[in-house]
């Protein structure tokens, strides 16, 4: 995009704020970056971006003022501040942050989960009928994974296709589906 903040080793593309997200782009310097996003509601969302990667970060608290604070890993779990900035977000539609793939809910039209969802839905289904159909499928075909819950590590991100193929998941996996 054309509207960015930050500098190497982390640049935030804020060109799509009105669509409900920003894109964090990390250069390939070998360190992990941490982006912390908080809104007026006080909830802080933390996103980690590996070296040379990018991540879509949604504005899930809706329109308002967000504080974005960016850090770079210096050693183990220690991070140094890179930059911080307040962002004014005015969404075109309150649902937009939830309609794009992001670090927590990563999907493409080619994802098995998307293909399955489309195969389950009738062409003339209403939005509510579609939601009900997918909900019923997930609750009938995915069971809670006690072992995974006991051993999950910090930084875990759901893989919706893996959850569907194994038929098991933890709360984060259910939420991503």
Each model region followed by its residue ranges:
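N-terminal accessory/pre-domain segments preceding catalytic cores
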Residues: 1-128
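Gly/Ser-rich catalytic serine loop of serine hydrolases
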Residues: 167-171
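Hydrophobic/aromatic-rich core segments of domains that either
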Residues: 173-177
């Amino acid at each position: 995009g054309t509207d960015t903040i930050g500098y190497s080793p982390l640049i935030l593309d804020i060109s799509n704020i009105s669509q409900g997200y920003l894109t964090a782009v990390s250069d390939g310097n070998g360190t992990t970056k941490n982006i912390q996003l908080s809104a007026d509601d006080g909830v802080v969302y933390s996103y980690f971006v590996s070296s040379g990667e990018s991540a879509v970060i949604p504005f899930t608290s809706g329109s308002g003022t967000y504080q974005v604070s960016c850090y770079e890993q210096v050693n183990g779990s220690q991070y140094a501040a890179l930059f911080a900035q307040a962002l004014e977000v005015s969404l075109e539609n309150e649902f937009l942050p939830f309609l794009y793939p992001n670090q927590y809910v990563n999907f493409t039209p080619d994802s098995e989960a998307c293909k399955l969802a489309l195969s389950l839905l009738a062409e003339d289904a209403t939005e509510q009928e579609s939601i009900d159909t997918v909900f019923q499928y997930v609750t009938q075909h995915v069971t809670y994974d006690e072992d995974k819950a006991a051993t999950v590590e910090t930084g875990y991100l759901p893989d919706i296709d893996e959850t569907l193929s194994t038929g098991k998941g933890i709360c984060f996996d259910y939420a991503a589906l």
